[in-house]
């Protein structure tokens, strides 16, 4: 009678399986590869050699997914193996392969994720560095632009100040020329006014002198040439006597002479009278003319 035997593990160790063999734990008479345990219920022991033959058969059949227990049993050619042993061991082998594949894939995924994370972190760090450099470059550009703008405004202010200074200097020169002309004209007017003032003072002094001379004496001022034309007192006395004599003679002769001699006497008397008249006129003119020159 046979007992149940577990199959060997998938890593090449002993995999147990159900097997009905002799109770004393001896090997099966059909194949020396089969080994039974010495337990009260003997089981088939999957030795390393038996597991390698199983793996070779599965590989020859195209892998654990394509191999079946029946084809594996024919390929292995081991007597004493049953479909039950192969089915259980194939199932465990598939599970082990799948777990190993999943672990491999997981490890690959983990490595890929790590690599991607490393790549992502490196790319992120590189992007951050690039962005930081770009920001620094932008800040430098903005600083240079602001500095250029400040320099331009400063240059404009200096230009405005220079033009304003030129205008102030030109206006100062213009005002200075106007002041010089005004001072020159004022000096000329002052000189003219000084001359007029001097002339006015001279006229005032002359008027004062004339007024003082006219009020300080009662004798009128006569011209020397006119004073020479006036007759003396003796001349006036002689002229008066001559006039009286001529008048007396004329009256006596008029009474003594005849009518025939009247014309001659009249002529002579007229001549004498004319002479006396001339003397009288000269006397009067000589006396009156000085009176007309009183100033």
Curated annotation (Swiss-Prot):
TM helices/strands, residue ranges: none
Superkingdom per UniProt: Eukaryota
InterPro entries registered for this protein in UniProt: Homeodomain-like_sf (IPR009057), Myb_CC_LHEQLE (IPR025756), Myb_dom (IPR017930), Myb_dom_plants (IPR006447), PHR1-like (IPR046955), SANT/Myb (IPR001005)
Motif (LHEQLE): 154-159
Chain segments carrying region Disordered: 96-138
Biased composition range(s): Basic and acidic residues: 99-108
PROSITE patterns noted in UniProt: HTH_MYB
Residue stretches in coiled coil: 141-161
Family listed: Belongs to the MYB-CC family.
Protein name: Protein PHR1-LIKE 2
Gene name of the record: PHL2
């Amino acid at each position: 009678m046979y007992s149940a035997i577990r199959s060997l593990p998938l890593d090449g160790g002993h995999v147990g399986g159900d097997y009905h063999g002799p109770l004393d734990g001896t090997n099966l008479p059909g194949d020396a590869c089969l080994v039974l345990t010495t337990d009260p219920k003997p089981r088939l022991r999957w030795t390393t050699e038996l597991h390698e033959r199983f793996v070779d058969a599965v590989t020859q059949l195209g892998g654990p997914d394509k191999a079946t227990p029946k084809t594996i049993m024919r390929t292995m050619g081991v007597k004493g193996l049953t479909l039950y042993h192969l089915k259980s061991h194939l199932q465990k082998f598939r599970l082990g392969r799948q777990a190993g594949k999943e672990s491999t894939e997981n490890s690959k995924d983990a490595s890929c994720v790590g690599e991607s994370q490393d790549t992502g972190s490196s790319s992120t760090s590189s992007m951050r560095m690039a962005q930081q450099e770009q920001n620094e470059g932008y800040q430098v550009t903005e600083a240079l632009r602001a500095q250029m703008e400040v320099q331009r405004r400063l240059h404009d202010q200096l230009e405005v100040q220079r033009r304003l200074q030129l205008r102030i200097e030109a206006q100062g020169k213009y005002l200075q020329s106007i002041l010089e002309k005004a001072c020159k004209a004022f000096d000329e007017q002052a000189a003219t006014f000084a001359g007029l003032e001097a002339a006015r003072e001279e006229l005032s002094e002359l008027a004062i002198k004339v007024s003082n001379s006219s009020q300080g004496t009662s004798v009128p001022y006569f011209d020397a040439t006119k004073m020479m034309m006036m007759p003396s007192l003796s001349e006036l006395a002689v002229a008066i006597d001559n006039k009286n004599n001529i008048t007396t003679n004329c009256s006596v002769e008029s009474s003594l002479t005849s009518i025939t001699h009247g014309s001659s006497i009249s002529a002579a008397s007229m001549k004498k009278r004319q002479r006396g008249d001339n003397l009288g006129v000269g006397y009067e003119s000589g006396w009156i003319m000085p009176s007309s020159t009183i100033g």
